[in-house]
Design a protein with these regions (language model features):
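Low-complexity, glycine/serine/proline-rich disordered segments
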Residues: 1-95, 104-105, 113
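Conserved beta-strand termini and adjacent loop/short-helix elements that scaffold enzyme active sites
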Residues: 117-119, 141, 201-203
């Protein structure tokens, strides 16, 4: 439809007419938030962040601090009714050094039961999380660069992999206030509604834990 075609525009749902009308008049966009990064424009579909704010569950999530947890290496993992067993070829279990360090901290300092999850190389396209933490899927992300939408870009396409994330910001040049802003934007975006928990770690300590 073209904005100049009045009859065609009237056939659109009201909410889209309002958006187009606002754009044509130079007004503010009502449903989308345009974000520009490195000369590339994309739409995050951000909702009103004043209405959608994550809960701070840091105290609750870390109440087991000082209690000894456990680290387990799972030798199999089930997805959609199919069990994939570690064979060293198609299914492997090779956690990185940083994944091991974070697991040791979560179990040793915060009493968590941390399970390393095998990686499925074949069949292709099978996404698995890095961990099961107290039975919940978690993926580890180490932030080392900058960008207005750094966190959004890291998690927006991980719906099938995990709804929960750990962000290690030890080597991230962004300020903690900017990281917090980006996390709140992720919770506000209509494209990342699958996000549940986000754990922020720095220098081996949990800084903040968010929940939807």
């Amino acid at each position: 439809y073209f904005l100049g075609n009045k009859s065609a525009g009237n056939q659109l749902p009201r909410r889209f007419r309002d958006v187009f009308a606002g754009a044509a008049d130079g007004g503010e966009k009502t449903e989308f938030d345009e974000v520009k990064q490195d000369e590339n424009v994309h739409w995050t579909g951000k909702e009103d962040s004043d209405k959608i704010s994550p809960m701070d569950i840091t105290k609750e999530w870390t109440r087991t601090k000082g209690i000894k947890g456990t680290v387990i290496e799972r030798q199999e993992y089930a997805i959609n009714g199919t069990t994939y067993k570690v064979d060293g070829r198609h299914v492997i279990l090779q956690p990185t050094k940083q994944e091991k360090e974070v697991a040791a901290i979560l179990s040793g300092e915060y009493g968590k039961t941390v399970e390393f999850v095998p990686q499925v190389l074949f069949p292709q396209g099978i996404q698995t999380p890095d961990y099961l933490i107290d039975g919940e899927r978690f993926d580890l992300k180490c932030l080392k660069s900058t960008g207005r939408n750094l966190i959004y870009n890291m998690v927006s396409k991980k719906k099938m992999q995990s709804p929960n994330f750990i962000f290690d910001i030890t080597n991230c040049p962004l300020s903690e206030s900017e990281i917090e802003r980006q996390i709140k934007d992720v919770y506000a975006s209509i494209h990342t509604k699958f996000i549940k928990k986000i754990v922020v770690m720095k220098e081996g300590k949990i800084k903040r834990v968010y929940d939807k």
